[in-house]
Regions:
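Eukaryotic alpha-helical scaffold "rod" segments
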Residues: 2-4, 8-20, 25, 557-578, ...
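Short linear interaction motifs
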Residues: 32-40, 572-573, 580-586, 636
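Structured, charged N-terminal subsegments at the starts of enzyme catalytic cores
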Residues: 526, 533-606
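Structured nucleic-acid-interacting core domains from mobile-element enzymes and related host factors
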Residues: 637-672
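Long, compositionally biased intrinsically disordered regions
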Residues: 775, 781-948
């Protein structure tokens, strides 16, 4: 028997409930003149009302009213208003059951509604079985089926029938896909795949498990471990059309299942399923391993360059005393010479009476040496890391299938020469004419190509970052052009906030920019800039003072005293079946273990319900990144619907910031050292927090990564982010590229720029700018470049909006482009225009500054809550894999969201109780009450759950 699709009560309600919002009522329940004509043929008011109601419900949600069903007041009011009837007129409808059936029969005849039976049902079943391959979840296939029933005017069958049909369709689709993949495998490849479950690697684990144990590293040993696996997989020559016609989400699901099965579990699967999972894993792991190799190479290059920088800095630090003494000696000699010149004494006598000419020569030689030390270049020391590259680079270049854009073809030729061993230090056409590498390469001995090899590998790293060089099969380092939205699809998408013609955008921005510059000039002359001034071409901005009303702090403390302890509930779905987890308490233990940074083994000791292996099983099959995202979205949506949340905002603005977490070992997963946070390796959780305090998005990024490219990820990769219109961030989160992308996509980007006075404005006509502002103008906007590249700019923005590629991936590549890349430069020009408009708004609008400050304060307070939640293991993230780190951060963020939801709900109840008691609280005071408190929550101890 096929498994049944188990829809949750929430999912069933979403499919079958009657609409209640004004928008949905207008869309689905507006009656036409024809409808009103049929309705008016009923003589009695209650029959007219009931006939109209049944018509509307048959159209949407597409079902029959159940006997005695309670109709929402909004529906009664909306339909009654169109008929001139009231709620009382519906009371007597269908006193006779026959009346309701007669009306249903008449509606089927008038409008062509049909029951789910006969040929129509067979056609729908055939359609459903074809459509099932594209469904991404149980809820998705049910939604597709319901939508098709509505389109064909087929009355929805019972919920149990829908679940049974969808279950059968999903099982059939799964088996068809598995059979399709397995049938494309030659016998020799089948034998190689099945051998993965029998062979062992390192006499410890099966080859199958060994192959999936990989993470990017930061040294040559890590690179070689990755290359061992990649080389092994490349010997399995899978057919090129293996996955043709298989939806991407089906491929991803098969891979994820393969990453959770052990060899014993795989052997127990049906043969087609086993082969399909093995083949998909081999195909996907090849691309993932290639990406991991490139990432590891990137880290090795970065570590070598930083080590070379440290050598330079150490030399300067070691010579600090000598520099002071040398400068002091020159100052003394110079002073004596100046005095002698003034007194008319021979200068030679002054030198002779001092340290003498020999002493002066020694001093000059010392100064020359110190000058060389102070000007030391890290490239002088990169040759010390040559041995690192020799351990893995030849294999890497042999195994990676590289392609290049025309601008990087000279580099690809140099890579080919390096791969084949024909090292020719004269091949330097891949270097820019102004590159410092030329000077260092000329200084090498004849026949010594080691530095040239390092130069090639350094530039290969940069080319991967910018996308000028790519891999033929890759997730992160593929050809970006293949992912960009076609130019002809931009107009159809309608998701961009700018005109399609560059002339229109330029004319609008020039008019706005000229007007705002004049306004700023007038304010500067009149001295009316809020909290600031422009004096002698220098901008001065004072820090805003706190604006919390009197009594806000006391109110917060008073309200929190009345909140009861917190309990946490949530549910995830099974990776393969899509069914909710039946063991809800076990699942809550797993989520809690991740969120408080305790780990499953210690959670098993701290709970009274589950063993470690039970928690492991639940975690492997029910906990994944997408499940955390779905759960977070549910909590955020529920919190936004609470009345108390409206005192803090409307969910249309947000702030984002990175939070550093210490990790245990450097070079594993995303663990890197960022000098800003000391010498301890770690990672950053980059989170978005709405004006209602909801942490609606979070992702793990390397500690050394710039935060700016990740701003749009949180806004575009989930529904809550798409409601945001104004985005705040701190200084580290802005670049001109981000300004441009946000403006094109319709977001107002408002970063708090710490060094704002040092930033320059840009104008279309700098000479026409007000005189007070000309010292602030940094240059002229290049209109011609924007016009030439406008179609490609729109393609990039449309691709970001479509979600086919993560915005951060595109923005990182643009930021890594060489200076001569015109597209990156054109997008920067657009960003300069938008940044100039924003800076003028910021200078003239104190309220904007205050909103940004409030938004960023909410984000920083949210960091404190997460820090309190993750108190176990001293707050260190000790997971060794990127996936484990992501789950740890996602669990932490989910717990924070649940606490915020609970606090919001209970604070609302407290406020409502005080209102009933006659104590009215000012909305201005309530706006300063935060749901981020945790003092009333007992986070540690023994976790005892009631027996189910």
């Amino acid at each position: 028997m096929p498994r049944r699709v188990t829809l949750t009560d929430r999912q069933k309600d979403a499919l079958l409930r009657l609409p209640t919002s004004q928008t949905d009522l207008l869309k689905h329940y507006t009656l036409s003149d024809e409808d009103l004509g049929h309705i008016r043929l009923r003589r009695r008011a209650h029959n007219r009302f009931g006939f109209a109601l049944q018509l509307c419900v048959l159209r949407y949600p597409g079902r029959v009213l159940a006997p005695g069903e309670l109709i929402p007041a909004e529906v009664i009011e909306f339909i009654g208003a169109q008929l001139g009837l009231g709620a009382d007129d519906l009371v007597d409808y269908a006193a006779r059951e026959e009346t309701r059936h007669e009306h249903l029969a008449e509606l089927r005849g008038l409008y062509g509604f049909r029951t789910f039976s006969g040929r129509g049902a067979s056609e729908l079943k055939e359609w459903l079985f074809r459509e099932a391959e594209m469904a991404v979840s149980n809820e998705d296939i049910a939604r597709r089926f319901v939508a098709e029933c509505r389109r064909t005017r087929t009355v929805l069958p019972a919920t149990s029938t829908i679940e049974r049909l969808c279950a059968a369709a999903l099982v059939d689709a799964e088996r068809r896909i598995e059979t399709r993949i397995a049938s494309r495998l030659p016998m020799s490849i089948r034998e190689q795949l099945l051998a993965l479950l029998e062979e062992t690697a390192d006499d410890r684990v099966t080859r199958f498990v060994w192959l999936r144990q990989f993470e990017p590293g930061s040294n040559s040993s890590s690179a070689n471990r990755l290359l061992d696996r990649l080389e092994y997989l490349q010997r399995i020559d899978l057919p090129e059309d293996l996955l043709a016609g298989v939806p991407a989400h089906r491929v991803t699901r098969l891979r994820r299942q393969g990453e959770r099965y052990y060899a014993d579990g795989m052997r127990d699967l049906p043969e087609d399923r086993r082969l399909a999972i093995l083949a998909v894993c081999v195909s996907e792991w090849q691309a993932m391993l290639a990406d991991a190799v490139v990432e590891t190479h990137d880290r090795i290059v970065g570590r070598l360059y930083r080590a070379s920088e440290r050598i330079c800095h150490a030399k300067v630090a070691d010579e600090a005393g000598v520099v002071r003494d040398t400068l002091k000696s020159f100052a003394e000699i110079g002073g004596a010479l100046v005095d002698a010149q003034d007194d008319g004494q021979p200068l030679g006598d002054v030198i002779a009476s001092g340290s003498g000419w020999d002493g002066l020569k020694t001093l000059v030689a010392m100064a020359t040496r110190l000058t060389a030390t102070m000007a030391d270049d890290p490239l002088n020391h990169v040759l010390d890391g040559y041995h690192r590259f020799r351990r893995y680079a030849p294999r890497m270049l042999r195994l990676l299938d590289l392609r290049a854009a025309p601008v990087a073809l000279p580099l690809l030729e140099a890579v080919t020469a390096l791969r084949t061993g024909l090292n020719d230090a004269a091949m330097t056409s891949f270097l820019r004419p102004s590159s410092k590498w030329h000077r260092h390469l000329r200084a090498q001995r004849a026949g010594d190509a080691r530095l040239w090899e390092i130069a090639v590998l350094f530039h290969l790293r940069d080319a991967f970052r910018s996308g000028d060089v790519w891999l033929t099969r890759s997730r992160r380092y593929g050809d970006l052009k293949h992912a960009l939205v076609p130019a002809q699809s931009i107009a159809e998408g309608g998701r961009l906030a700018v005109p399609l013609r560059p002339e229109e955008w330029l004319a609008d921005r020039q008019a706005r920019l000229d007007m705002r510059l004049r306004e700023l000039g007038r304010a500067a002359r009149a001295g009316t800039i809020p909290g600031g001034s422009i004096e002698n071409g220098v901008l001065h901005i004072e820090k805003l003072e706190a604006a919390a009303p009197t009594g806000a702090e006391d109110l917060v403390l008073d309200l929190y005293k009345q909140i009861p302890p917190t309990r946490i509930t949530e549910a995830f779905t099974h990776l393969r079946t899509g069914a909710p987890c039946a063991d809800r308490i076990g699942l809550m233990n797993v989520i809690l273990a991740e969120g408080i940074n305790l780990g499953l083994r210690k959670m098993a000791d701290a709970t009274n319900t589950h063993t470690f292996w039970e928690l492991i099983r639940i975690g492997r099959w029910h906990v994944e990144g997408e499940a955390y995202d779905r759960a977070l979205a549910m909590v955020v949506e529920a919190q936004a619907a609470l009345p108390m949340a409206r005192f803090w905002g409307m969910g249309t603005s947000a702030s984002s910031d990175g939070q550093f977490f210490v990790a245990t070992e450097q070079g594993e997963a995303m663990n890197l050292v960022n000098a800003k946070y000391g010498n301890t390796p770690g990672l950053k959780a980059y989170s978005h927090v709405s004006d209602q305090y909801a942490p609606f998005a979070t992702q793990v990024i390397p500690a050394t990564a710039s935060e700016a490219p990740y701003i749009l990820d949180g806004l575009l990769m989930n529904d809550a982010g798409r409601h945001i219109r104004e985005q705040f961030t701190d200084t580290g989160g802005f670049t001109d590229h981000v300004f441009a992308a946000c403006a094109i996509l319709g977001y107002r980007f408002a970063p708090r720029i710490r060094d704002l006075p040092s930033k320059r404005l840009y104008a279309f006509n700098p000479s026409a700018a007000p005189a007070h502002l000309r010292a602030l103008i940094g240059g002229k906007v290049n209109q011609a470049m924007i016009e030439r590249n406008w179609p490609d700019i729109l393609r990039i923005a449309a691709t970001i909006a479509a979600g086919t590629v993560a915005p951060s991936q595109i923005l990182r590549k643009l930021a890594s482009y060489p200076r001569q890349n015109e597209l990156a430069t054109a997008l920067r020009e657009v960003g300069r225009v938008e940044r100039t408009l924003f800076m003028i708004d910021w200078i003239l609008d104190a309220e904007l500054q205050r909103r940004a400050q409030i938004g960023l304060n909410k984000g920083e307070a949210h960091h404190a809550l997460k820090r309190a939640i993750s108190f176990h293991r001293r707050g260190e993230i000790r997971d060794r894999s990127a996936e484990g780190q992501h789950y740890r951060i996602a669990g932490m963020n989910l717990l924070a969201a649940i606490i915020i939801f609970w606090n919001t709900m209970k604070l609302g109840e407290v406020v409502a109780n005080q209102k009933r008691d006659g104590k009215l609280l000012s909305p201005d005071l309530l706006a300063h009450v935060s749901p981020l408190g945790w003092e009333h929550i007992n986070l540690t101890g023994e976790y005892r759950w009631p027996k189910p």
